[in-house]
Structure formats: C-alpha cells, structure tokens
UniProtKB/Swiss-Prot annotation:
Its main location: plastid. It is found in: Plastid, Chloroplast. Heterohexadecamer of 8 large and 8 small subunits. One of its GO terms (cellular component) is chloroplast. Belongs to the RuBisCO small chain family. This is Ribulose bisphosphate carboxylase small subunit. In this alga, in contrast to plants, the small subunit is encoded in the chloroplast. The basic functional RuBisCO is composed of a large chain homodimer in a 'head-to-tail' conformation. In form I RuBisCO this homodimer is arranged in a barrel-like tetramer with the small subunits forming a tetrameric 'cap' on each end of the 'barrel'. It comes from Pyropia katadae (Red alga). Keywords: Calvin cycle, Carbon dioxide fixation, Chloroplast, Photorespiration, Photosynthesis, Plastid. The gene is rbcS. One of its GO terms (molecular function) is ribulose-bisphosphate carboxylase activity. GO terms for biological process: reductive pentose-phosphate cycle.
C-alpha cells in the first residue's frame, strides 16, 4: 500500500529533475528547507528524524539536493521527505512537504475495529512495518 502523505503523494514518484524544480521553487520563495526520514509510516507519526540541520538562507537548490542524496544513501529503505518552512511573521509554519524516497516494499496497514457500548465502533491503524524493530523494518 503506497503511503500518501504530503504534496504529490498521489502522483508517481518524483524524478530527481522534478525534485530539483520543487527545491528551486522553495529557494526562490525564501523558504527554509529540511530533510527528514522515518521507518514508521503511521499517518499520525508527525515526528520524523531530522537529517542534519535545517537549511536556513540557502540560495542554491543543489545544497538541499546534496542533503537528500546523502540521506537516501545512508537510509535507502526509509521514507525521506523534504519540508519547506516559511518564517514570515504570522505564518511561521510548514508550507510544503513531499516524499522524495520510499522503501521498495510498502506493506501497508491493518485496520482494527473495536466494539464499544451503544453499538459504537472505534477504529485504529497499525502499520505492518512496525512489527519489526526500528531500523530493521524494510
């Protein structure tokens, strides 16, 4: 099951050329970029591991692409994403995020249903990948 988080997630994987164009857009808007990775694909896992330091005041998209390449090389079977942060007063938020690397095999999620009082159903998601210990999931 393909993980769909962030921009472009329903499209085919971005090529390096397409990623470079998105990075050029991020840099042209004066946004700060950072690269993050994880092997826990749960949709509510919003705390991915930060790769290096955030790239503030970067004037060239190739610096961000270098960090992406380094992360991909070190973590080939992890999800890797780029975030763009706008520090403009009043916004101060992540304004763009997209996945740039994913594992070759994405096992998907188990939907667990639980019956509660009053015929209420509660649902939870469990990633098949997390059945293995961290670092050995893919």
């Amino acid at each position: 099951m393909r993980l769909t988080q962030g921009a472009f997630s329903f499209l085919p994987d971005l090529t390096d050329e397409q990623i470079n164009k998105q990075l050029a857009y991020i840099v042209s808007k004066g946004l700060s970029a950072n690269v993050e990775y994880t092997d826990d694909p749960h949709p509510r896992n919003s705390y991915w591991e930060l790769w290096g330091l955030p790239l503030f005041d970067v004037k060239d998209a190739s610096a961000v692409m270098y960090e992406i390449s380094s992360c991909r090389k070190a973590k080939p079977n992890y999800y890797v994403k780029v975030n763009a942060f706008d520090n403009t007063r009043g916004i101060e938020s992540c304004v763009m995020s997209f996945i740039v690397n994913r594992p070759a095999n994405e096992p998907g999620f188990l939907l667990q249903r639980q019956d509660f009082e009053g015929r209420t159903m509660k649902y939870s998601l469990h990633s098949y990948a997390t059945e293995k210990p961290e670092g050995a999931r893919y």
